[in-house]
Amino acid sequence: MTDTTDDIAEEISFQSFEDDCKLLGSLFHDVLQREVGNPFMEKVERIRILAQSALNLRMAGIEDTANLLEKQLTSEISKMPLEEALTLARTFTHSLNLMGIADTHHRMHKVHNVTQLARSCDDIFSQLLQSGISPDELYKTVCKQEVEIVLTAHPTQINRRTLQYKHIRIAHLLEYNTRSDLSVEDRETLIEDLVREITSLWQTDELRRQKPTPVDEARAGLNIVEQSLWKAVPQYLRRVSNSLKKFTGKPLPLTCTPMKFGSWMGGDRDGNPNVTAKVTKEVSLLSRWMAIDLYIREVDSLRFELSTDRCSDRFSRLADKILEKDYDRGKSNFQKQQSSSCLPTQLPARAHLPACIDFGESRHTKFEIATTDYMPPNLQKQNEQDFSESDWEKIDNGSRSGLTSRGSFSSTSQLLLQRKLFEESQVGKTSFQKLLEPPPLKRAGSAPYRIVLGEVKEKLVKTRRLLELLIEGLPCEYDPKNSYETSDQLLEPLLLCYESLQSSGARVLADGRLADLIRRVSTFGMVLVKLDLRQEAARHSEALDAITTYLDMGTYSEWDEEKKLEFLTRELKGKRPLVPQCIKVGPDVKEVLDTFRVAAELGSESLGAYVISMASNASDVLAVELLQKDARLALTSEHGKPCPGGTLRVVPLFETVNDLRAAGPSIRKLLSIDWYREHIQKNHNGHQEVMVGYSDSGKDAGRFTAAWELYKAQENVVAACNEFGIKITLFHGRGGSIGRGGGPTYLAIQSQPPGSVMGSLRSTEQGEMVQAKFGIPQTAVRQLEVYTTAVLLATLKPPQPPREEKWRNLMEEISGISCQHYRSTVYENPEFLSYFHEATPQAELGFLNIGSRPTRRKSSSGIGHLRAIPWVFAWTQTRFVLPAWLGVGAGLKGVSEKGHADDLKEMYKEWPFFQSTLELIEMVLAKADIPMTKHYDEQLVSEKRRGLGTELRKELMTTEKYVLVISGHEKLLQDNKSLKKLIDSRLPYLNAMNMLQVEILKRLRRDEDNNKLRDALLITINGIAAGMRNTG
């Protein structure tokens, strides 16, 4: 399992970390004294001391006494009344979360206070130049870099969003506490604020009481963008630019975007029936609406800042032209709308603060379409006259959903009244309002930037209104003269402002808030994050089955691969739609076709890739290309104009071991088809994207075999693309945990096969890792920088391949033994499934309400149909973390005993891929706890199956032994003392939580309908996840 500290391996000051833990712990103790009373707090402290003492004795090797103390601890917990057990679970969960906050603060503090961090731009640029890379090559490679982080809604974020925000506020207060200039009064106020936040934490329900909808999940992802990435991106790009200027003499071009963002939230329908075509459209429109709203705020702040009247002649003519246009219409922009006056009558929030300290805090925590309660009497009468009773009935009956904080929509009638108010804002304006507004300008020279930006804001406001109409499903027409559709349209006036300021001697103004806004528009575009669509390959086959059967052509899925390719290629070359308008299909097929129709409506300006999960053949890709083409032709015919944007790039996702082995041949076959090769040359700049999945391959064959098969699959895909002169971008579907391909970003990228990272990369960030890596601007900047430098290094100085063919052969042998051992245990042992259900809280994880999708692909109790997340999640809870290491020990042992131990040691020292694979397994082993897994077995597992647990623990010890031998380490995490200390600091609370979970599981399995017991169990799951710093 990975802590979020892993990407920042520098030592942090543990004295100050411990001081913060003591401060938060002391304040929490005071809060609890008031909330639950002193007698109960004495019990809490006794349990903590018992757990700490047992841990200390075990670390000292005094096992017998440690066992006695743990038995006493178990006995005391078993005698606890349910209410006390529930309160104890809450207490230790909050304690672990507060320790996590202290850790987050110290990573932030380290980033601020170290002059040159390892893996920073300054560090890596310097290394590359010293290694012989020329400044020009370095500059060009950075400017051409294309990295995209894709945020997903995989259900691994266990904390409610409310609690996440409170945790961030506490981290910021700790940061403020480090200031040396605080007065006594300031510090007292700060402590009071901390007490308030901790009290609020305690009095807030930790559990989600209902499952989130896909729109809820999308809203959470967009909040990360608004609260953190919106601020982090300009800071990150400024850092890259400054480093480039320092080492190459040239800054990063203003519109250059080495980093972009995508999302699966609202687009990932693989196994999730709740993600429909309607949901995808709503989420995409929500994303656009929010982008425009953020830009309006930034333009407001910019208009306040750019009060200068010095500008270029060209810019002055533009401002004059805007004024003339307004006067030609008979009314000035500055009279028509308060929002477009030369100086806003009400300054934007935080406008008085410099951009460097604007943390981008939300001014709309709810995504609601704004309405007003006040309406002048004359407008009330006018609206009553304008709308007859029958009109109101039609509106009421036809009202749809638009966005509110609960995912519902405001009524159409409200929106129509709001539009009326917008259009007739002069009617009923009071004398006070007129007095408050500045007088209109008569000439552009007074404030040319405010005039131009005033028009920009007006167009943005109208664009937002158009989106509100689209959300409501009301008719509207896009007018390029009055609104924006593409980022290039918005960039044009902003770049003119920038050029004018530079040419008139105001470069310092140009390079401030304006440059930040230009970089935001270049990075986030008009949608903040482009939405990927994902669907399983079999669903497309079902759709084509329905079509070919209707057309009396046979059943598509029954054809062999060659016949499928012949049919698909022929239809793709044709110019007519394949799907008849009159066709009647079942609901599942209709949903697939509706999704392609929405994709055609939104186009590539709003959407990213179409990802095909469980892809295995070239026909899987062509099937999507055909359905996409057909939907676009049909929509073009209906509307009489081309669909917006271009076709979506189609990305096959290879997941299982067999599919990974077929990835290279599948891509080679695909690129050998003339139509397809010409299509990607023409529409996608000769670029093929291929996704590889880490979760299902790991569950299928074990982590070690999955890692090796992924490595080979990437080599084969790269080779196939090179044969046809096609550029390749690999899309890595990594989870947060090591069992699902997670791990430190830098380590992961640096261990890819040579040639697989050629300046471009896509990678998912899931669940709790999104919040951990990008939830705070300072940590987000650091993570973006790590992505940039890791990809840069892998591009210019690729990692070494295996030194000799013998190393590849040894990997094959280790992988074969490991896979056979893993599968014989997990899939072939008839007792394993029952052991899994008894020894872990897997069955109870479904009560958590942490995701909108089901935990299984199909209604079966088998492990094959269980998703990878609950599979990993369940083993993480018991501290067995089995998916990440099972089979590894057997493989290493088998090869070592054949006389290859020295070869394995050389591979560890010289082959980055092999080294990183073992290092990740070592991190997992450091979080595993053999005595705790034995405790779960003794208390929860039937006696006839306990022998299986014993065997698994022997395998765990074997794995640890051989990992240490091959790495040359005497103990786990020998080279990562920071992580070891952080793990050890959490163990007293974590051990007590595990014992409490075992007791609650015992009671719950005897009384399944007891909601209080269920709540207590879920809180222990939260607490253990906080202590392990991972879920699934």
Curated annotation (Swiss-Prot):
Keywords: Carbon dioxide fixation, Cytoplasm, Lyase, Magnesium, Photosynthesis. Disulfide bonds: none annotated. It is an enzyme of class 4 (lyase). Coiled coil: none annotated. It catalyses: oxaloacetate + phosphate = phosphoenolpyruvate + hydrogencarbonate. It comes from the Eukaryota. GO terms for biological process: carbon fixation; photosynthesis; tricarboxylic acid cycle. The keyword Magnesium applies. Signal peptide: none annotated. One of its GO terms (molecular function) is phosphoenolpyruvate carboxylase activity. InterPro entries: PEP_COase, PEP_COase_bac/pln-type, PEP_COase_Lys_AS, PEPCASE_His_AS, Pyrv/PenolPyrv_kinase-like_dom. The active site is at 154, 699. PANTHER family: PHOSPHOENOLPYRUVATE CARBOXYLASE (PTHR30523:SF6). This is Phosphoenolpyruvate carboxylase 4. It comes from Arabidopsis thaliana.
